[in-house]
């Protein structure tokens, strides 16, 4: 299970720089191959795209025009929303459970600055091991993994192939 909750916020005015954020996105935004595999990944048809709010409506996230050129980058909040499903314009703050050690806002921002200077130091995209959530989580906690991917793998293992 996820060791965090997503808390809907009214907008960026309610978020401090260094906060991990997320927007709802469709699986079809990941790769066209996954469109045919919806039911294997989740009971739902979406995931949450994660990033770190910087300031002045800027977000650090792991993205690209396609997954091959995905890398740590900075965009404005509207571009970050466009990575979402296009219909839902809700913004969520990621709040980790108390058993997860969370870095300070300042330390998170230092990590963001460092990786944005040398984005090639971050490994390439891989749906399960290296995605937007694992990137944002690493910036916020120092841990490099994705709860969404772990849950999806669990669903594949226990879900019946035929309903």
Stretches with model-predicted labels:
Residues 1-163:
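Cysteine-nucleophile amide-bond enzymes
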């Amino acid at each position: 299970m996820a060791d965090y909750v997503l808390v809907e916020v009214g907008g960026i005015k309610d978020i401090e720089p260094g906060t991990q954020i997320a927007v709802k996105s469709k699986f079809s935004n990941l790769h066209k191959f996954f469109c045919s595999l919806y039911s294997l990944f989740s009971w739902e048809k979406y995931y949450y795209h994660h990033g770190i709010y910087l300031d002045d409506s800027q977000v650090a996230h792991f993205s690209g025009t396609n997954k091959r050129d995905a890398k740590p980058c900075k965009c404005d909040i509207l571009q970050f929303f466009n990575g979402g499903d296009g219909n839902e314009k809700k913004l969520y703050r990621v709040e980790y459970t108390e058993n997860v050690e969370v870095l300070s806002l300042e330390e998170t921002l230092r990590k963001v600055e460092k990786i944005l200077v040398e984005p090639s130091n971050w490994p390439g995209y891989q749906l399960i091991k290296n995605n937007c959530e694992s990137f944002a989580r690493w910036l916020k906690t120092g841990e490099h993994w994705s709860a969404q991917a772990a849950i999806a793998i669990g669903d594949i293992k226990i879900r019946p192939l035929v309903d």
